[in-house]
Amino acid sequence: MKEVRIEAGWKKVLQEEFDKFYFEKLTDFVREEYRQSPIYPPARFIFRAFDTCPFDRVKVVILGQDPYHEPGQAEGLAFSVPTGIPIPPSLRNICEEIRTDTGQPAHIDGGSLLPWVEQGVLLLNATLTVRASQAGSHQGHGWETFTDAAIEALAKRREHLVFLLWGSYARRKSAMIDPRCHLILEAPHPSPLSAHRGFFGCKHFSRTNAYLRQHGIAPIVW
């Protein structure tokens, strides 16, 4: 993974993980996968969620499960796609909830969520790579251990963060977060399969900003 870099603050926090045997095995697995098959995102974007949202600047964490696995979609940020790529259904539903919740259209660049990242929104997938057209193909190889360590580091070393946990997989991560120190907001996944079961109407975006303001933190322009 020579192309990969990670922001200095995250590197300091996660150095113990880099030094563990599971991460060495994970690195070997991912390197071999990139050698043999089309893998997403491009290798230079594996740690992009961390690189674009420094540890000390995180205000909000949105958890995804897997990168997009079709050509041109994955850019290393959960739910985000590059500008010019058609907006996937889950992201379309996120934008719809923002519009009804805040009364404003989503402040994004096409389907790219970089405008959020630049304000301190960490868009973290639990698994950071995937084989083309094979959803979940890189689960169970160590990425989840690594990203759990990142979530735990934020939960223990920072305060007054907002964790947006959408869907049953993300909601299980609440066990790592102290609700006395952070705001945890849970809802069904924004996928068309589940958005009507409680994602629509959850008002997570206005509730996030109310909490941030309450603690003297600049709100997110969603």
UniProtKB/Swiss-Prot annotation:
Q: Which HAMAP family match?
A: UDG
Which EC class does it fall in? Answer: hydrolase
Role description: Excises uracil residues from the DNA which can arise as a result of misincorporation of dUMP residues by DNA polymerase or due to deamination of cytosine.
Q: What is this protein called?
A: Uracil-DNA glycosylase
Q: Which reaction does it catalyse?
A: Hydrolyzes single-stranded DNA or mismatched double-stranded DNA and polynucleotides, releasing free uracil
Q: Which GO terms describe its biological process?
A: base-excision repair, AP site formation via deaminated base removal
Give the EC number(s) listed in the UniProt record.
3.2.2.27
Task: List the keywords (alphabetical).
Answer: Cytoplasm, DNA damage, DNA repair, Hydrolase
Write down the InterPro entries for this protein, in alphabetical order.
UDG_fam1, Ura-DNA_Glyclase_AS, Uracil-DNA_glycosylase-like, Uracil-DNA_glycosylase-like_sf
Chief location category: cytoplasm
Q: Which residues form the active site?
A: 66
Subcellular location, record wording: Cytoplasm
This protein's encoding gene: ung
Q: Name one GO molecular function term.
A: uracil DNA N-glycosylase activity
Q: Name one Pfam family in it.
A: UDG
Tell me the domain of life: Bacteria
